UniProtKB/Swiss-Prot annotation:
Keywords from the UniProt entry: Developmental protein, Glycoprotein, Glycosidase, Hydrolase, Signal
Group of enzyme by EC: hydrolase
Lineage per the UniProt record: Eukaryota, Metazoa, Ecdysozoa, Arthropoda, Hexapoda
E.C. designation(s): 3.2.1.52
Protein name as it appears in the record: Probable beta-hexosaminidase fdl
Molecular function as annotated in GO: beta-N-acetylglucosaminidase activity; beta-N-acetylhexosaminidase activity
Keyword match Transit peptide: no
Length: 660
């Protein structure tokens, strides 16, 4: 009896144990499946190589060139080498230089790999200062190449994204080459099939480093492979042409995520020159303040796109951020805060940095209108009222937007202050044949409150001529060859001599003033509000009233705008068009949006003014090839830390031709 009970108990214990073991096994199996499922969700198409390391999902694709288009196909590994998107794009179809060369280009289909440490410079010029400036430009060229490699290291591949490293300041960072970074990680140093890249830059003629609309910007570039060495030669007549050659060379180099090396063409030839002399971007730093670093970042993009004029709208009625040596009261009374100011050193630093990238800084102190905050201290200094209508309400009676403010045209101290500021700015930015006086949107009702003059427009004319005379005194008694003013009711008269003044036309492209200004003999710079104003289309920023301008100007709008063709200008009139400029007024833009509001739309203007491609196919439709090239250029901007706006879904960027 006791034996039977013992047996039953033993069987019960065994059964319980078996059930427990089966339960544990079943539960573990479920967990394993769940983990595998979750991992599959996280890495939907992950594979492993022979050593067991996971293969990134993007490397399961390769690209092949068919009918000048890169086609994405599955890559199964062992028999054929994977071709990355960027390497396919750079060797398939038309030349991938932005802006497109105007004269001659030839790129081989064969490419070579190398590391940034393999690149060396030799300068051939009779001018010592040009040699020094080219060495500076080349140093920054190498830093840009290192930045591209650094960006890839932190996780970007053939289609870049804005990484943590690229969002930080790029101008004083101690960046190491990517080959070194990868070597430290994997224990080996990557070596390309080139052992040396020798860059020779020859400046044949001018030793002048001063900016002028007469600068020779032409250049020739060639590369030739000799064994394991690549010979690069850039030939130009001036520093400015040579600098554009460096920008082109930078666009002939790319970073391949397959071997983590830089690549370029085995052989190439480019001969290039701009169609227009003035290729500008205007940034308003009064309505919002922008740091020196953000301005430099903008200039980097301009240099890569071969733009040559940074128009710095330094002050306006909203604020006066510039700290004048002679009249610091302007910033004390006019800046938003102590930290939101530009010192003399800041302006010099920006100008010197811009020259490295072939960009001239053109500062503008708008006058007599658009001058309010910062100008209210005159009576305390015994200088009388320097400005009128400052912050006056209702603002719509006395200015175009709040706050109001207009300089006093009958106070001699007003002109003395302007002369001193002009003198300072010319010292900071260097000798020039171009200066901007402002001069637009004067509200005559403001002055009418204070003066009984029957010809208030004549008072406006007198002010501009006085400002011109003071500029001449500030410039050692010589007026710059081109003194610019904004188009206005005043430029519709013959008050300002056409031999001295250039008009920046901001009104609509169909307005009669476009024709009248040319007929009256003025040189012009086009900045039409309906095409090249980049602040439009974001709605009204006031509680009442419509937006200042709408709709949004797409990069296609910017690109297709050819006013000289649509106006059917003859050769004489077209010669009066110095070029064009996109404008970024900053009522609704601060440093957080600057990059994506500017880029890549500004690049669209760059090609319009450098290349001026024809409208043979359609005046309104952008050719598909342009989409592909500007997409690649946009990616280059992102690699340099510029947060350029996306053009279309990433799928479309990786599959050219399927979306457009």
């Amino acid at each position: 009896m006791s034996l039977a009970v013992s047996l039953r108990r033993a069987l019960l214990v065994l059964l319980t144990g078996a059930i427990f073991i089966l339960t544990v096994l079943y539960w573990n199996q479920g967990v394993t499946k769940a983990q595998a499922y979750n991992e599959a969700l996280e890495r939907p198409h992950s594979h492993h190589d022979a050593s067991g390391f996971p293969i990134p999902v993007e490397k399961s694709w390769t690209y092949k060139c068919e009918n000048d288009r890169c086609m994405r196909v599955g890559h199964h590994g062992k028999s054929a080498k994977r071709v990355s998107f960027i390497s396919c794009s750079m060797t398939c179809g038309d030349v991938n230089i932005w802006p497109h060369p105007t004269q001659k280009f030839l790129l081989s289909s064969q490419t070579h790999s190398f590391s940034v440490e393999d690149v060396q410079l030799h300068v051939d010029t009779a001018h010592r200062e040009v040699r020094k400036q080219l060495q500076l430009a080349f140093d920054w060229f190498l830093k840009d190449l290192r930045l591209i490699q650094r960006l890839d290291y932190v996780g970007s591949s053939s289609e870049p994204t804005v990484s943590e490293s690229s969002s930080k300041s790029r101008h004083h960072a101690d960046l190491e080459p990517a080959a070194t970074l990868f070597g430290a990680t994997f224990g080996v140093k990557k070596a390309g099939d080139l052992t040396s890249v020798q860059v020779k830059i020859s400046v044949l003629k001018s030793g002048d480093l001063n900016f002028s609309l007469d600068n020779d910007e032409t250049y020739q570039l060639s590369t030739q492979t000799e064994g394991h060495r690549l010979q690069v030669e850039i030939i130009a007549n001036s520093y400015f042409g040579a600098r554009h050659g460096l920008s082109t060379l930078q666009q002939l180099i790319w970073f391949d995520d397959e071997d983590h090396l830089l690549h370029t063409y085995a052989n190439s030839k480019v001969k290039d020159a701009p169609k227009f002399r003035y290729r500008g971007l205007m940034l308003d730093t009064s309505r919002h303040f922008f740091s020196v670093e953000s301005i430099k970042r903008t200039i980097v993009g301009m240099g890569l796109a071969k733009m040559n004029r940074f128009h710095w709208h330094l002050t306006d009625a909203q604020s006066f951020p510039y700290i004048s040596r002679y009249y610091p009261e302007l910033a004390v009374h006019g800046a938003y805060s102590e930290s939101e100011t530009y010192s003399e050193q800041d302006v010099r630093e920006v100008a010197e940095f811009a020259k490295i990238y072939g960009v001239q800084v053109i500062p503008e102190i708008d006058a007599p209108a658009h001058a309010g905050n910062g100008w209210d201290w005159g009576p305390k200094r015994g200088m009388g009222e320097l400005a009128m209508c400052i912050n006056q309400q209702p603002w719509s009676f006395y200015c175009g937007e709040p706050p109001c403010g207009q300089l006093n045209p009958k106070n001699n101290y007003t002109y003395l202050i302007l002369q001193r500021i002009y003198e300072e700015l010319l010292q900071h930015t260097g000798p020039t044949d171009f200066f901007h006086l402002g001069g637009d949107e004067v509200n005559l009702d403001c002055w009418a409150q204070y003066f009984n003059d029957t010809d208030l427009r004549g008072l406006w004319c007198d002010f501009m001529l006085q400002a011109m005379a003071r500029l001449k005194l500030a410039n050692n008694g010589v007026a710059p060859k081109h003194v610019a003013v904004w188009s206005s009711a005043l430029t519709n008269t013959k008050c300002l001599p056409n031999s001295q003044f250039t008009v920046q036309v901001w009104g609509g492209s169909t307005w009669q003033e476009n024709y009248d200004l040319l007929d009256n003999g003025y040189n012009v710079i086009f900045s039409h509000v309906d095409a090249w104003y980049l602040d439009c289309g974001f709605g009204s920023w006031r509680a009442t009233g419509d937006a200042a301008c709408a709709p949004y100007r797409t990069w296609q709008n910017v690109y297709k705008h050819r006013p000289w063709e649509r106006m059917r200008l003859d050769k004489k009139r077209k010669k009066q068009v110095l070029g064009g400029e996109v404008c970024m007024w900053t009522e609704q833009v601060d440093e957080n949006q600057l990059d994506n509001r500017l880029w890549p739309r500004t690049a669209a203007l760059a090609e319009r003014l450098w290349t001026d491609p024809s409208d043979d196919h359609d005046m309104d439709i952008v050719p598909p090839d342009v989409f592909r090239r500007i997409s690649l250029f946009r990616n280059r901007l992102v690699e340099l830390g510029i947060r350029a706006e996306a053009l279309f879904p990433k799928y479309c960027a990786q599959n050219p031709g399927e979306c457009i």
